[in-house]
């Protein structure tokens, strides 16, 4: 919410499987407790979405969550979306099949996608000092090197 461009690789149609962080952490805990040694367990959220769709959902959710009189609303816009050159070898789709972890361990995501986005945004609102720290200095240089100079 700084009014900066929102870089999107390629055409933004790369697909990823999205999972709320607490659900991911719970899956890891359950694998440690109940998983079989040497086995691999895929953790997925059954939420395959295109990157551009995620950005649009985040923008829409921010506008829903910010009060009408909040000055930060002016800094949230789909007009900030900027398409940048795709990375070489960038996978078009990551597909996760979490059937095994559900069958063997009983794990499945509990948080609905939209609720996870809202919780994530709320966390960032509650930790604005942290946000200021990671968007300055070394992190900012990394961001500029990765996205703004493409």
Feature-to-residue mapping (PLM):
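C-terminal substrate-binding subdomain of Rossmann-fold SDR/epimerase-dehydratase oxidoreductases
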Residues: 1-150
């Amino acid at each position: 919410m700084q009014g900066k461009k929102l870089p999107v690789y390629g055409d933004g149609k790369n697909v990823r499987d999205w999972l709320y962080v607490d659900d991911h952490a719970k899956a890891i805990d359950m694998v440690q407790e109940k998983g079989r040694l040497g086995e691999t367990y895929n953790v997925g959220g059954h939420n395959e979405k295109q990157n551009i769709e995620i950005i649009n959902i985040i923008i829409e959710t921010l506008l829903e969550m910010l009060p009408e009189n909040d000055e930060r609303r002016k800094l949230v816009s789909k007009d900030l979306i900027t398409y940048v050159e795709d990375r070489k070898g960038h996978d078009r789709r990551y597909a996760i099949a979490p059937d095994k972890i559900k069958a063997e361990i009983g794990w499945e995501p509990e948080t609905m996608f939209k609720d996870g986005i809202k919780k994530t945004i709320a966390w960032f609102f509650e930790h604005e000092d942290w946000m200021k720290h990671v968007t300055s200095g070394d992190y900012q240089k990394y961001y500029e090197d990765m996205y703004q100079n493409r």
